[in-house]
Amino acid sequence: MLLSILYIIGITAEGMTGALAAGREKMDIFGVIIIASVTAIGGGSVRDVLLGHYPLGWVKHPEYFLMVASAAVITVYVAPFINHFMRYFRTIFLVLDAMGLVVYSIIGAQIAMDMGHSLTIVCIAGCITGAFGGVLRDMLCNRIPLVFQKELYASIALFATLTYYALSTLQVEHTLAVLLTLINSFTLRLLAIHFEWGLPVFNYQELTSEEQDKQPNKKK
């Protein structure tokens, strides 16, 4: 019950952030709904396809898609009127996104565990569910996914997955396991945002032909 409530809050918030991303790319209402849906439920769909878990979550519960689509349409008409206050809403969205990330990861991990998969697959399922909606959104908006650019996001999904898996393995009561995972991972995500923690970045620039010609010849 707790996960279901948090999941609904999460997909609504993700749908709204997806709609805003589509608006920045000047998409029509159809594009807005598609980007919002991909952001909110795309990660779970990718997970289900890879694991052979059918029917897909939003096919089994079409009301989830309707919630996301409704949130997207509402965002289209409300966003222009609250543009001056968007910096305050951005903070709210960051908090809700952090919560959604953890909730998605827990759900992905639980589905993989219910299917009897190993820890490796459980971790992959949790990370895909938590982070790949944003990856698909950025790809469709022709941007390098934010998940791949230093920020601790997929790493938090992995941390949440491992935490939940460990607690479940120790046979901690389900609701308590969810709450402990949510509190720990949610707090870590907010700290990462505040202190701008990130993973090391690989910055490789290949020399042009002119730059290579300027390099001193190395004697053998």
UniProtKB/Swiss-Prot annotation:
GO CC annotations on file: plasma membrane
The record's listing under Pfam families reads: Gly_transporter
The record's InterPro entries line, in alphabetical order, gives: Gly_transporter (IPR005115)
What compartments host this protein?
Cell membrane
Q: Keywords on this record?
A: Cell membrane, Membrane, Transmembrane, Transmembrane helix
Transmembrane residue ranges:
26-46, 65-85, 92-112, 116-136, 152-172, 175-195
- The secretion signal range is none
Stated membrane topology is: Multi-pass membrane protein
Q: Which family does it belong to?
A: Belongs to the UPF0126 family.
Name-wise, this protein is UPF0126 membrane protein HI_1240
